């Protein structure tokens, strides 16, 4: 879709160049939702549907259930990018019916440089190794090799052991929390901040509906987003600026980047108030 992170666009484009695959993109409508009519009209003949669960720019959750149902009705498999969605709510891959689901540790209190791909059994049995070396082999001779039949056939070489241990600890911690309760608490903070930003003359990108994520992307009509980031950083406030690795979506919105405030389990309403206090001070001084 036009909402995808670059990581769900770039390599498909590389494969299209290498093997002639046809790529089709589902557009975003003016209300920031996907054009589901266009999706249904363009899915014929597709083999794989790749879709982000929740936009890392807008925080808007896509209608995943409908997307998966329509894909399966047309014989296509579904790869769900849950890097942004999984840290904020409990996602049951089996109930959704997704064939594959991708996660990233750094979005859920874990280390950088490690992620995972969950695959259902039917899809897993059809997947072949894509990288050679190390423990992914069963036997090796000078004439040829055979490969492990379990998940190890995809894990060539020395794995990221320290990162995996760190992620396990993070998942154990998150498992002690009620993520659905945390989601509602953080969504309340995001809604409050979004309303305050609008009252200060900001344009806020996102809806913050019940199923959406607690990220708030915004722009000031005159003060550049990078200036905001530096000025907030000097006050001890961390925000993200730029295109957020989602340039096609930003192009659709007609902008080059936003300021993004991301609220997670360690944030409180007091943090939000402090952020707004610093932001008001910046506006008084510079805008």
Question: Where do the protein language model's features map onto the residues?
Answer:
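Pyridoxal 5′-phosphate
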Residues: 1-287
């Amino acid at each position: 879709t036009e909402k995808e992170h670059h990581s769900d666009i770039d390599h498909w484009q590389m494969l299209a160049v290498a093997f002639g695959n046809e790529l089709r993109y589902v557009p975003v409508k003016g209300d920031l939702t996907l054009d589901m009519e266009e999706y249904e009209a363009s899915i014929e003949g597709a083999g794989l549907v790749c879709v982000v669960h929740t936009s890392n720019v807008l925080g808007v959750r896509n209608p995943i259930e409908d997307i998966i149902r329509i894909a399966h009705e047309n014989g296509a498999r579904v790869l769900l990018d849950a890097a942004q969605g999984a840290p904020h709510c409990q996602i049951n891959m089996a109930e959704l019916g997704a064939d594959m689901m991708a996660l990233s540790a750094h979005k859920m209190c874990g280390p950088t440089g490690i992620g995972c791909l969950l695959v259902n059994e039917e899809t897993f049995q059809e997947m072949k190794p894509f990288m050679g070396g190390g423990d992914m082999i069963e036997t090796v001779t000078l004439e040829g090799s055979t490969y492990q039949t379990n998940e190890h056939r995809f894990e060539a070489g020395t794995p990221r052991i320290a990162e995996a241990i760190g992620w396990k600890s993070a998942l154990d911690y998150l498992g002690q929390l009620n993520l659905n309760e945390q989601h509602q608490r953080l969504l309340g903070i995001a809604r409050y901040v979004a309303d305050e930003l609008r009252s200060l003359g900001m344009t806020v990108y996102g809806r913050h509906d019940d199923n959406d994520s607690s990220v708030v992307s915004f722009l000031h009509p005159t003060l550049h987003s990078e200036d905001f980031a530096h000025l907030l950083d000097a006050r001890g406030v961390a925000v993200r600026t730029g295109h957020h690795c989602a340039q096609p979506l930003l192009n659709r919105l007609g902008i080059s980047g936003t300021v993004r405030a991301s609220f997670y389990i360690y944030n409180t309403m007091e943090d939000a108030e402090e952020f707004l206090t610093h932001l008001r001070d910046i506006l008084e001084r510079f805008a």
